[in-house]
């Protein structure tokens, strides 16, 4: 193992990656460079720097990069253009962060002359695949160290024992126990493990960290507007905002109204089912708003094709194929569809619910003249429907005659 001289570790400062840092130093006897991505997780960052220093990493080998704008602009918004929902529900908050972390990790590895990269994903989960597909897609010959697939620490309890033995501070949640397995960024917060591993048990209220209980949300609804240009949000209530600023503002609105909670049993790429609790307050609002503006700006054929492609697109992201040619091909088609997806959506937020209550666009395909139940002044000749129906019924009539119906 001595052939590894320097490794770049994706480091959150949590239990797993703190143990991994010490384990790499001991097992590989190499220099460890830590990289912490600021994706909007907030207070997690400075403790990560302090912990890395405490464990012997010099300042010049501690990287904490603010990637919030890049994350939303180049990853979240493109994904949202595709209306991606994994298994019809999950807004992919963890999945979409991994390719950016992997990309920056490889950039740092090249800059510091590292021999390898390392991550804290377990051998049971999706993240090991997502990270490593990103690494290999960007640096085909990079060496990857995945401690969970190498060491004999087979449980969280074993990790805690290792941490205590080596005087590594172990984070505690507000109930005085070791924390859930969590992931946080500007798009979402996820929690897994402990009581959540029983799919029959209701998620305890203390697990939710990002949204108020919908029952305790304001008793009055709040009306907002989101402006879109070419498929991307650009303004909230008429105020222009950068991508990260917009999502941050929507997160606060969603938090206040208890929006974006999801209790999901999902199918992992590696084959097993897992249960996760997700909070995506701003993303839930944004997703519905984007669907709302598409309703009046996309042609039926384009809209239906997008709906057919969306599950495949979401699956590619979930499984870690962000840098694959097929994801890029789908992205090109999706982005082309967004050329006229410009306008304003009005939404109502109330006790965990978000509802589109208005939409307008200079490129609208909605014609009140044509669709009205009142006199349309010749905008639509209803007699034309007879021929349309006869042509579409032809094959059904032929089948019926043949089969004696």
From Swiss-Prot:
Root EC class: ligase
Main location: cytoplasm
GO terms of molecular function: argininosuccinate synthase activity; ATP binding
Residues binding L-aspartate: 122, 126-127
Enzyme Commission no: 6.3.4.5
Signal sequence annotation: none
Subunit comment: Homotetramer.
Entry's family note: Belongs to the argininosuccinate synthase family. Type 1 subfamily.
Protein name (database record): Argininosuccinate synthase
């Amino acid at each position: 193992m001595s052939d590894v001289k320097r490794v770049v570790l994706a480091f959150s400062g949590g239990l797993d990656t703190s143990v991994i840092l010490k384990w790499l130093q001991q097992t590989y006897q190499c220099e460890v460079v830590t990289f912490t991505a600021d994706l909007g997780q907030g207070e997690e960052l400075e403790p990560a720097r302090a912990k890395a220093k405490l464990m012997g990493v010099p300042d010049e080998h501690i990287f904490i990069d603010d990637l919030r704008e890049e994350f939303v602009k180049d990853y979240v918004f493109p994904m949202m253009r595709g209306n991606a929902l994994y298994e019809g529900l999950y807004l992919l908050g963890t999945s979409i962060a991994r390719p950016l972390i992997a990309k920056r990790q490889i950039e740092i590895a090249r800059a510091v002359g590292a021999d390898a990269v390392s991550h804290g994903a377990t051998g049971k989960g999706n993240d090991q695949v997502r990270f490593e597909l990103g690494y290999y897609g960007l640096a085909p010959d990079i060496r990857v160290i995945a401690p969970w697939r190498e060491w004999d620490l087979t449980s969280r309890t074993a990790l805690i024992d290792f941490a205590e033995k080596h005087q590594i501070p172990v984070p505690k949640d507000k109930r005085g126990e070791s924390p859930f397995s969590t992931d946080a960024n500007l798009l979402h917060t996820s929690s897994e493990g402990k009581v959540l591993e029983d799919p029959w048990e209701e998620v305890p209220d203390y697990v939710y960290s990002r949204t108020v209980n919908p029952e305790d949300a304001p008793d009055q609804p709040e009306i907002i507007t989101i402006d879109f240009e070419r498929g991307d949000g650009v303004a909230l209530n008429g105020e222009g905002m950068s991508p990260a600023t917009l999502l941050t503002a929507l997160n606060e609105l969603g938090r206040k109204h208890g929006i974006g909670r999801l209790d999901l049993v999902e199918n992992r790429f590696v084959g097993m089912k897992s249960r996760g609790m997700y909070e995506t307050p701003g993303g839930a609002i944004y997703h519905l708003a984007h669907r709302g503006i598409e309703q009046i700006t996309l042609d039926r054929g384009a809209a239906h094709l997008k709906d057919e492609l969306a599950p495949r697109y979401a699956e590619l992201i979930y499984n870690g194929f962000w840098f694959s040619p097929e994801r890029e091909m789908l992205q090109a088609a999706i982005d082309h569809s967004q050329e006229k997806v410009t306008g304003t959506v009005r939404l109502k937020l109330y006790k965990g619910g978000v509802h589109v209550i208005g939409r307008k666009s200079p490129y609208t395909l909605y014609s009140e003249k044509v669709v009205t139940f009142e006199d349309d002044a010749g905008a639509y000749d209803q007699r034309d429907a007879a021929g349309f129906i006869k042509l579409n019924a032809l094959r059904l009539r032929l089948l019926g005659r043949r089969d004696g119906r």
